[in-house]
């Protein structure tokens, strides 16, 4: 596995630990205001400075990790489960089922740019973490379905699957016992890249005012609130922006490293 993958695991691990232990790491209440301390730069008391309401930026970035990872993990889990089931059905049964799912359903969802579709869904459903997760799941499952369909189409022709069919095993047994366990490796890569996409999408929608509503410390909301004061107080925008960039890079590094590790052709290069 590449060095970048290990760097990605290290960075992602730090953010996961920050999310888990946020109440113990954060030095201030994330909603506590102190107007006398507005836009104070980084100090020993406020490591990342304060924002326009005197709130501690470090504490808000730490709790923002919890929000971003909650959204990312939930979106990836739900999208992967639903996409795996639909993709496996399409690839295993083939024929009309495959033509309908991969030729029509998949293409309908892929015809729209993902972020624009998410914006439309959130605008319809309303703001909130649960509704944001639902919108991102709607646009996210198709990627997993396409990967799983391709894997099932390949694995179902292997000798051990044909032998199980000849011995009279049921379709469900063949699918869940012989095919899926040998087709999930690419989904691991897809999930790590999906985490990066979900974190970035959550931040983008929150930046547009369609994600996690204030005063929750979403990284995207923090960037949106700070952008007009960047010239005078760059720290307010820099730290949440850096958190977004590092998280997205970390999971992309992990995905690339896992692809190289799990693919023998990539390892031999």
Residue ranges and their predicted role:
Residues 22-25, 71-106, 119:
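Transmembrane-helix boundary motif in ABC transporter permease subunits
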Residues 1-28, 105:
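N-terminal signal-anchor/first transmembrane alpha helix
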Residues 110, 121-125, 136, 152, ...:
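Glycine-rich helix-loop "coupling/hinge" segments at transmembrane-helix boundaries
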Residues 21, 81-86, 97, 131, ...:
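Membrane-embedded alpha-helices of multi-pass transport/permease systems
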Residues 47, 51, 57, 83, ...:
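Generic hydrophobic transmembrane alpha-helix motif, especially the helices
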Residues 1-3, 28-76, 222-241:
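Periplasmic/extracellular loop-to-transmembrane helix junction in inner-membrane transport proteins
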């Amino acid at each position: 596995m590449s060095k970048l993958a290990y760097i990605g695991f290290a960075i992602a691990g730090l953010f996961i630990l920050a999310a888990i232990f946020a109440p113990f790491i954060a030095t201030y209440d994330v909603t506590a205001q102190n107007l006398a301390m507005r836009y104070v730069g980084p100090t020993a008391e406020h490591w990342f400075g304060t924002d326009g309401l005197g709130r501690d930026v470090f504490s808000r970035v730490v709790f923002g990790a919890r929000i971003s990872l909650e959204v990312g993990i939930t979106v990836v889990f739900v999208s992967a489960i639903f996409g795996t089931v639909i993709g496996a059905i399409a690839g295993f049964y083939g024929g009309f089922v495959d033509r309908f799912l991969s030729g029509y359903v998949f293409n309908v969802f892929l015809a729209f740019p993902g972020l624009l579709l998410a914006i439309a869904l959130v605008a319809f459903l309303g703001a909130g973490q649960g509704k944001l997760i639902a919108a991102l799941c709607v646009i996210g499952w198709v990627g997993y379905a396409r990967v799983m369909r391709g894997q099932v189409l390949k694995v179902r022709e292997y000798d051990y699957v044909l032998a199980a069919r000849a011995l009279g095993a049921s379709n469900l047994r063949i699918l869940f016992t012989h095919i899926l366990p040998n087709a999930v490796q690419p989904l691991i890569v897809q999930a790590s890249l999906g985490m990066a996409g979900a974190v970035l999408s959550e931040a983008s929608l929150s930046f547009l005012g369609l994600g996690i509503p204030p005063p929750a410390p979403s990284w995207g909301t923090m960037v949106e609130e700070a952008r007009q004061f960047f010239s005078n107080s760059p720290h307010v925008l820099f730290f949440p922006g850096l958190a977004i960039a590092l998280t997205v890079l970390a999971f992309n590094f992990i995905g690339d490293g896992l692809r190289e590790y799990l693919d023998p052709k990539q390892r031999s290069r």
